[in-house]
Amino acid sequence: MSRVFDKSISEKYSKYFSSIGELTASFVEYSLAQSEPVQDQEKKFQPWDTGKVGVPLAWSRKSNTIFVDHTDTHTLVVGPTGSKKSRLVVMPSIRILGSAGESMIISDPKAEIYNRTASYLEQNGYRVFVLNLRSPMHGQRWNPLTIPFEFYSHGEIDKAYEFVNDIAENLIQTEKSVREPFWDNSAGSFFFGLALLLFKYCHEHGLDSTYVHMGNIIELRNVLLSVPYQRNRLWAYAKSDQIIAAALIGTIETASDTKAGILSTFDQKVRMFSIQPNLLDMLSTNDFDMNRIGAVPTAVFLIVPDEKTGYHSLVSLFIKQSYEYMIFNAQLEAERDGIHTGVLKNRVNYILDEFSSLPTIRDFPAMVTAARSRNIRFTLIIQSKHQLIQRYRDETETIQTNCNNWIFLTSR
């Protein structure tokens, strides 16, 4: 644990924190590097340790100092509606992290966090980006298909398949029916095949990534189903690739009733793209290099409507894709330098408000476990532990175990 070095931050947020003398037993016993309680640790600190920042845990009334956890520890924040999670944890954390230039990816259901902290970060030299799913025209653009297409174009076929599969699972196979998962799985396989078919066509016809987007995936779906498959030239072209054929044949050449069920499921999952041209445009290209998040001070705000859940799958997908892509590039650079494990140059902090409201992120327990050695931290903010159990079931214990800091807030 260390002191935050910017005293103005301490003065701004001190009223929200317990003093050292008022800490509960769990906080007093909590020690990151030594076994002695916080009161004894305080005597050893040099004033304003610089560059060591993290989630705020306590405040000293005597020295007007906020104490933070600057290690690679993850944090779980539990508090019901009205417990001021954003004001007590999220906003102070952003200002503290911003004072040291650490990167952040922040889910922001109400855009309140962005409105209160973006200008501060910009003044501190941050590159600030906004993916605004509430108002797609007012923010940056992000195409989730660009990265896998780049892998495909450079011959990294397995990696391209991996990233496309992540997209299919997060957009199409979310909230699978327990009784009949066949429809979601089949729709996901259909999406996987369409994406690879689009990659194949664009790569072989010299078309760049501007042609690779959700709108053209929907267009391919329509062309493939426009005429019977026996005389469909696009289907004949698709079957020249075994992987694409295997992914699509279960829909294209199946019985009519089964085909109708799969297509109905698929169309329902992608409807938000087909009926919202502004959203489709936002997801058609990239305005920023995702890999730079782990290289230079960057803040990405993921603004999503909190009154409906239809867009939450895109937030889960961004979290998954950004994590995987940054680690891939860090590992690639490490291998070039003869190092075993790739570590991000600039620490990235995922601050995920309403985390348990997001669709399940595939492999998240493994992500949160491996993040520590990659210079990545997670702050997971939920309303109750029960919500987390509902979402991640048997994997909840792994997530909780990897969060050494637990902060409980009450609205009373």
Residues covered by each model-derived region:
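Pre-P-loop entry segment of helicase/translocase ATPase cores
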Residues: 2-69
